[in-house]
Amino acid sequence: MAKTYKRRRYYRSKGRWSANIKNIDDSQTLTGPTNTTVGNSVDLCLNPLQDSLTVSQTYTVKNIELSTFMETENNAYVEDIEHYIMYVPQGMNLTTEYNYEHPEYIMAYYFQGNPATDNTSPGYRLKLKTRMARRLQTGDRIIYFWKAKKELSSDIDVKIRGLVRWWTKAN
């Protein structure tokens, strides 16, 4: 008679992904001479630094979808607009050249070129998404980073409004 063996199967539980959404409402006054490169960043998702009051846990971020509207005031406009979703490790300094200094951290990008046809009510719509995933350690963050060329010598007020959605899973 043949011997039978009973095998035990072990199952590993899958991580559960949760959806997150955030409202973006940011404004900045751009100063400087004509043909200056200006830019700004908005934190999309952030893993805070761990201190004596908070405990930070590493987690994975994926499927980031960004929908924004950029509006300039003072009858002014900006040209050669570059949009990025970028990863920023803890302690990294942000400059207007961050995308060229660390191209390995670019998750998604879009070049808008010269969108201004008239400067009475310039507004720039943008939808940007990435399926790339990043594991965020303590102090890391994902940002929406934009930069543009300032065409006028006067100050320009820029407002960015929109929504961002992403998925997270604890590691």
Language model features with spans:
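Capsid-like jelly-roll
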Residues: 2-171
